[in-house]
């Protein structure tokens, strides 16, 4: 078996040097340089040195980080931020080599040292990792690979427009052991392509059809009239840019917009031959000897122009609400949305920076993202929103004419589009100012999806105002990003049309009465305005993978005059405009773009009159002279009435034609410096500084003055209030404000470096060079660190925070179809990751399913009456607790957010801790929980840079954009399928060649065993012959089968073991010493069987495979616990099609009779068999019930809804019901109205006293299940339904009002506390329990399930089973707090005690059918549970508890004590449990073919892990030969370990923890309570495993360490294994718990010094574990506020070991197995692995995705990744981040001691059942990293290790560290992997997730809690938003 790992030698010791610029280089002789200029020069020095070193073959990189402490009080920017250079030299060096010295001559060394593999510094390791990637880049460029951030793709010119298969891409991440560095080569495929000739053709066609605004185009390349000198001619006819397709550019992988093309010869003539632009590095693109890019234009090679960058708006009062300034922005650039209320537009403008840049790239350096049609059909919730390349851009392709999203694009929702009404925009997000849009094509300039625009170009003059054009349809946070022209901005008393607008032009021109009358067009108004029509182009203009294109809706077909082919007929010889006028497009975002309308006084508009005139002259042919109206005519109505009937020609003194250049030959200049080169031969273009700020409006225009100056051939910038001199334009890339602008006094000169920097950062278009690209990337990286206030504009990705929360939140507004069902499509469209934005290739996404392709369709948008007070949806704050406007509030009266949250928290926990819930888990991970994960990921994309430019996150294509914090794969529209054959072929060819070239000493791709061994191998590790599987390699190393079971006698015989145990040493030779030494360092490689589950069967328990769940009703199986009686009520909207379908659904759920499918009738809950229990309707009548007839008696509670929705359904077919239902929803109901009715209905339910535990009845009383039918299918509506239902029901069942009030006050006090934590109140931190709910179950049923249209498509029986199983697991009946007599007097029968008799391995309460979990334990198993909690007659009672008490456990009066009577917990009664804990005991050492065969069997009794009494999992595992006695003699009945996973919510307000044990049997609190009894001598210590998702923070771990040493006192010294071996700073190992650090001692002076009552019979032992986790680093104490001096042993008398591990899903490993190893029947192949070699094209290969087994792999020596969180987005904190977040991140992540992997069967991916034929899934890989361990050995194990140490020499610390870590890690990993199989269900037979279920629940609960916290925290007052 091959891996994708390569080994690099010679890098185990590396010298590193860190550089910063020399101070002398930053002061070039005068002291007037600004700080910003120094920063830019410093950046240039560092980056140019880096590129030079890289070119010469050195390992080098640059990093941008904060030097010194972060001090937000210093303003928006950290003053100490610098760009640093790193140089790595293999070996030990005290100085830099002479070869490198020249490149760093202008830098100074600020730090240096030696990096010793695997490294112990996160910062150095990350920099080293990046330098290795840079080195590989050089090698790959020689074989035609281009770099796009962290992703590499091979350039291959394509003749086709798109590929059906994705483009292969390569990523590299790096790991290290003590001896070598390993490269993990991640092969994937992306839906991208290179540029094609069709792109140029479409751009040409688009420019011709819209010549009123033509693309900046080269006449030569577009085939237009050629100028005599072939100079570039920009036809810039308007300041309004056209919207261009997004592209991804090399080398940084940033997202940009394609804006032009140019042939090779022209670029060479201008750049390469002129010699004016010199660079010390090189140009972006493939090396010249390889060749250039595609032949895009007339069979010739071509360069392209790409616009990169963004803009930042940092003022909290510059909202784009209802404004139109966005229409004046340069290409694809929008101001960052100001997220807040509409009142924000009244503030002052204060743009912080402007950053846009145009680069000229070779075609091979540009990729175009595409979307395959099949994926679009699949992921309707995500795929329509093409702002994944930058959410704020939201621009459609200028030439990809798709738009007009009016339908769902889904077959099941096809009826939605047919009933479309009201607006054609994204109605639920638009700003409604003037009522509905007119039902014509012209009004459809908005984008219905929130993304696209039917015609986003300049509208030709129209005399009729278009109501609704002011509507804005951007994403949430960008709602008011104007699309199209605002022809009627007459509303809301605002004059936002500041700057260039069509009305300004028309004001200059006056009446259009005879403007267009000539021979070409004999009519009196511009084309397209007589009627409401818009041009629509054929479908070939789209670039979607061969799918239909959704076209513009028009009323009828229009036939244009012949002369209207383009505007060329108006002006046969159009003037050639010099490029200097294009500066108006290159200087970004002056106050024109974001100043609120009322900030632009009318008196100031005259200042721009000459500019308006110039704009007009640029727009129209010269024979039509400009006209100008006196100011008196346009003063107050300048932006109101675009037509002035008395206008007349006036030559303004400010508008002299001599000031503007129109000729083909531009004015000459005597400036020939590098800093003054203008694109394509144009001469210097003078920036108008005018002594104003960079953001002044006039700087959008360039004025050529007659006076020129020259000073030493370098341009200067003149700071003057009245005139502008020639000079270099001010840098637009500096992040400083106007006060920090570059101020170069005339007559002074700058040095060459400053000139180069000015050139690179000027506003001019430049050829893409290495240094220019990296300079721009570095600038964008710095920009992402801007600290933004919650009231300020947020980086674009953060605007998604409240994105879909706005769904249907227009209160008091009759909703239309768009408001409800089509809104789901908007959700589908919204949620494509931010990096793929723009409306590229997406016209087909929501095409009408029955619409013809490429034809005209009429616009018939019926108007829907809206109230005059229809509110505007404004953007809410993107930061916590102010995310919503008043219009998004649920109007349920005055809400109390905190009280609501506390009411609903128990039921929220119930929902999140369900193993599988189809309502939340459907859509292949794209359901509500997937939606929450995506939202969280987008909020983390601050690291991507401003406007999601993707400068600092690894590029647009990086895998980190589709992985959540746990490594779970999320929806990624760019992801494509990659096949094992492609992977191994690429690894064996290009990658192998490149790594050999880059590093010389490179072996690979390694076999599994070679990778696990991690040491030098004989021969060429990269040869084809090394492509064995792990089995063959294991058997061929010196003839020894190196399994990882450490069974010593397997290799050395029993005598050697005996010698080791006896301590014999006299007869051993040096050879045997080496053998022993190598034995300690062997890798782990095991084949593990898939875990089985335990269910009930008749009066016994049965061990079955997880696949058997599909046969539940046929077996018939029974639940592991007892049957449960269920009384249910269904709350359903009173919509006839829905109620009919729901009635049928719940009847089948209860009786198992299916009317639509011919499956078995007795399904699940059939009461006569009592398989799960009874399921009967119960009338919970309330005032809502009226005229419900049979529904009332059937347990239905109907919600009131608008009368217009109550349509009678006469359809009996499913399709008819669907059509009727969607038609009903289109009649005016929205989510807000539904939730209001739902809340009222739930609060009125007569639940009665039956919910509360009756001690006499015990568990015999039935549970009440409330089913909520959610009528809206979109994820946010389902989530909001859950939140509102939980709150409403929680308020009903809450009985203890006094306790509730106390809890509310405590939580409120905790939230309102100051930054400085009051240590005295630590003991009063509220801890909320998620399982104090009585016999009540909340189950939301989606409309998809009701209509049986789930995605993926489950059959009806599966849906019913999963729903029933989910309800069964949620139902809890037995109270842990009731008296024991009542507890055990249940009337329900238990399993027969005789059933336990034949299972001799079982004792006490354990239900098992197999052997012990881990044999060989020295501790007896009897009495694991406190005898007071069980009796001999109830052996099975307490085994139904699950430690899913989920971090939310609570006693408001907790002061170190826990009183059962204060809070009652209800025990978990599971449907099934694991038959045995995960363990390597039953693992198999792989042989030659076991990995490829399903016939592997456990190793025989005498030689394998599967037999013999091994060690307890946390104690280490002994060899098989050391325990030859009987199992019973060693009392090897192991006690399951306790597992805890915890994590913080995103806003760091809540800590969530979930407990379980290795078999999902016991509840952690229950066991800990039993531990606390001093009289319980039979209870044995347990192993504790503390798990963190992702990584432990170093400070976080140190706090754990302090707690352990403080609590354990001197007992800690007695634990023989402490892997880190050092006590925390300030903690003495002989401490009795009171000798803490001095600052900590002061915190507990006022606490009681008496013996803690924590260990009394009623104490809650979980206080320490849970309480300490919830405390911030460095300050928190333990044990509920009392000292533990009187109890020196503390908790640890019941703790055998404590382990800390981090967990995530790994995507860095590929495993490829020769397919011929497995015969058709699954048996072993006759060829054997040893004879199989890979031959490209002839050796069939497969992945491990379909394997029946799991594989555990732990490399040796201990391996760790150089980057602590590979494939994860970088974390960027802001001033809004809580102090705890800053504190924990300050020291980075804890470095793991060892990392292991468990490879198992593939979990259904996002693409499964998505109409994509996925031939083979890749396996799921669980990564487990050991952080630390405290514990001990058993005697046998200790003797063996001591014997080996004596034989091999050396100390125990140096010889057994790795074997200890391996033994511990493999046991932990096995248990964690087994816990993932608890998520199996009939719908997910291969598990729902590969994460352990308790870790997955932490993810779900923390996200749901965060969502609920924000949902209830909406503030009704606008000012609070």
UniProtKB/Swiss-Prot annotation:
Residues 400-434, 702-724, 1485-1528 are annotated as: Disordered. GO terms for biological process: regulation of development, heterochronic; regulation of radial pattern formation. Residues 407-427 have a biased composition (Low complexity). Ubiquitous. Highest expression in the shoot apex. It is found in: Nucleus. It comes from the Eukaryota. One of its GO terms (cellular component) is nucleus. Changing residue 407 to N: In gct-3; uncoupled cell division, pattern formation and morphogenesis during embryogenesis. Pfam families: Med13_N, MID_MedPIWI. InterPro entries: Mediator_complx_sub13 (IPR051139), Mediator_Med13_N (IPR021643), MID_MedPIWI (IPR041285). Transmembrane segments: none annotated. Component of the Mediator complex, a coactivator involved in the regulated transcription of nearly all RNA polymerase II-dependent genes. Mediator functions as a bridge to convey information from gene-specific regulatory proteins to the basal RNA polymerase II transcription machinery. The Mediator complex, having a compact conformation in its free form, is recruited to promoters by direct interactions with regulatory proteins and serves for the assembly of a functional preinitiation complex with RNA polymerase II and the general transcription factors. Acts closely together with MAB12. Component of the Mediator complex. Interacts with CYCC1-2 (CDK8 homolog). Belongs to the Mediator complex subunit 13 family. This is Mediator of RNA polymerase II transcription subunit 13. It comes from Arabidopsis thaliana.
